Amino acid sequence: MHKYTLTFRSILAVGFIFICTAVGWFILGGALTHRSMDRSGSLMYEVQATWGPQLRQAHPIAWYESPANASGRSSVSPSMSRVQVDLQYEPKRKGLFWYRTYQVQFAANYEIPNPTPIAQTVYVAFSLPSADASYNNFTFELEGAGVDEPILREGTITQAVVIPPQSTVPLQVSYHARGLNHWEYDLNGASRVQNFQLAMQTDFESVNFPGGTASPTDRSEVATGGWDLIWDYPDVIGAQSIGMDMPKVLNPGPIASRISFFAPLSLLFFFAVLLIFGAVTGINLHPMNYFFLAAGCFAFQLLFAYTVDLMPIHLCFFLSAAVSLLLVCGYLHAVGGRALTRIALPAQFAYMVLFSYSFFFDGLSGLTIAIGAVLTLAVLMRATAKMDWSTVFVARKRVLAGGDR
């Protein structure tokens, strides 16, 4: 076992090694960010072109000509709406990004009314969610007398029908489409919605409603996984739109870059523990030992960054962590024996592995840093409470006089 005297110069040398390693991590994180962001735009375009864009289905609108109105028409809302939506989540991966793609089966039955005491030619318009999406098994059936052929113009189907006074005609619409990120049903800012019900079924358990949309009035969990959600509006004024965000996925690129950017903080804690416990136990390491330890820690993020797009992200993370732990702890065991390994192994596992793994969960990295810092402070305060710090930093002349180099 090799022992070295702890001096102020050796601490400066360790600090220089730390700074150089931190610069390396920043370069690695920047390269990962550039690698991810440089292709994200083109990959997003490819996904939208091959799979489909975000889908926003609008509530149908209807009107009849009314010369008495300033606009020349009077709007009517469906007197009854029964909408069924089935969402199937199928994320797709391209490069270092997962894209939250899904399939939707849409089916709706509406009743289009004529609220006047005379027969009216009512025009019904149904807008498709996006002009860039494809719609399989599409049906649009408007029953009634004098129905013209539907006209498709700029993503909106318009059809006219003659409705007897104080009567309704049924409208049926259904299709199968594919979309990205979230699905939404827009009520077109209707001031009043009556006899409306939307039933949504998902095959995923993590549900999140986009900002500005309403929560369901009823929900029940499906035994096979997923939810049955219902929005029931018997008579609502100012009803909000209805939407569903697809579950979040772990994107390897952003996670790998964040781990690299925050790795210097982990190394700072790790080096602090080794320096202080070295002063307590008398097992002080040479700055060159710290150089190899920094390289072993750097190997974790380096391996993770360049294998994360080749294998599942969790498997890649734990394999990279295992390699780094083996390098660092194996080296310390060879240098300082079991006494040093018993200190370094839990420290590296806590600061490097657990802290890095917290980036897999939103909002936990800051809490992990705070808890780790407080626990580290408590352990170091207890370990050094009875230590005579005046004997730790030895003057250079005394070192040379004693012959301990």
Question: Which residues fall in each region the model found?
Answer:
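Cytosolic-side membrane-insertion boundary helix
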Residues: G238-L267, L285-P287
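Soluble non-transmembrane domains of integral membrane proteins
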Residues: S42, A49, W63, S71-V236
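Extracellular/secretory-pathway and virion-surface proteins
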Residues: A58-I61
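Generic detector of multi-pass transmembrane helix bundles and their immediately adjacent loops
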Residues: L267-R405
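Alpha-helical transmembrane signal-anchor/signal-peptide segments
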Residues: L28-Q54
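Hydrophobic membrane-insertion alpha-helices, especially the h-region
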Residues: S10-L28
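N-terminal positive-inside, membrane-proximal cytosolic segments immediately preceding the first
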Residues: M1-R9
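Juxtamembrane loop-transmembrane helix junctions in multi-pass integral membrane proteins
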Residues: T7, K248-R258, M311, V335, ...
